[in-house]
């Protein structure tokens, strides 16, 4: 089953074709009673705007994807030329329930949440409340690194995973139920892998020091700060940073594992909200992407966006994780809470996430102000390829079956399918003037 947002129906039908908006007899359409910024921006589309994405083909590909055994529910959004041009839900919130995923269905973002924390810190830095070049100890006293490195590692080093720790340090202890604040204090017991700022290694427990510094700087709990300074001004009404926020949503997707078996909800990574705590529906994720493209300068100006999207460290092993795309994928970098890539000569920015029955992705071209977001509620990573199919449409590149829909089964254990939560890699850092 699938649903669409029927907003400004006549204008959208002209833009994407009546077939994209038509409701099939066995589908469930969703019409939101209260207009949101997403609705308003959809309604403002001009039929004269150039469209590079073939939305009929995209919808066909997504329908094919949903026939795969591991898929339960999914929501996808596309922004083109700075405006939302596609919002659609597919499948079910819970396998066998008959409850459809709609553009209003809330999912978990997992590690795509890191971009929210980095954006929040960079916004505070622009206001002069945080110095990105100052020692992280100045703002997050709970973080104690080996050899006293909290006094040498900068805030920028924290946001770009250059703290000199082995990858995913103490994730296992976090998953055992230990308190993340306590764990950050005990990182001092580890052996350093390098001097801060000189190598890269993905973190969750340590990275969440970002939420501590936001709370200490604003005087607000992290969720309230994010809501006040980011979600409310952007118009992200469904955005939340807690398990209660997810479960309290009118429509929310339940997590599933292999065989469409439901998984229990756990709050482990909500305890490190800067690393993996965000929830929202696909509408609001698309609005978030618009803001990251510079379309809401009153909320996020070019100074903040340039700071967080800049490529601070080369991550060659990311190319290993994404090796099936190497025909077009060049250098991979990490910025502040964001990955970036050279793809067919274009600089693109994004992130993936995965946690306990949820997966997510965001990828966009800041120059073209175009990109894609997706959320789904199963442990399969096969949709990781959708973003590159959309990019190929935007760049008018020859079609490649990046979704591997012609394969009988996806290679679920391949490196490129690893989620961002609980996975990472190490690489030498490239020193820059910022960071």
Can you describe what each PLM-predicted range is?
Residues 2-87, 218-228, 232, 263-435:
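Catalytic loop of the DD-peptidase/beta-lactamase superfamily, centered on the K-T-G motif
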Residues 53, 57-64, 111, 116-120, ...:
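Extracytoplasmic/secreted proteins, especially bacterial periplasmic and envelope-associated proteins
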Residues 103, 108-112, 124-166, 170, ...:
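Active-site helix/loop module of the DD-peptidase/beta-lactamase fold
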Residues 181-193, 257-270:
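The feature captures the short pre-catalytic strand/loop hairpin that immediately precedes
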Residues 44-51, 106-108, 142-146, 169-174, ...:
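Second-shell loop/turn segments in exported
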Residues 87-90, 168-174, 241-245, 384-385:
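Short, solvent-exposed loop/turn and secondary-structure capping segments
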Residues 54, 58, 105, 132, ...:
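Residue-level signature of the cytosolic catalytic core of signaling kinases
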Residues 65-75, 96-158, 194-205, 273-276, ...:
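Short active-site loop at a secondary-structure junction
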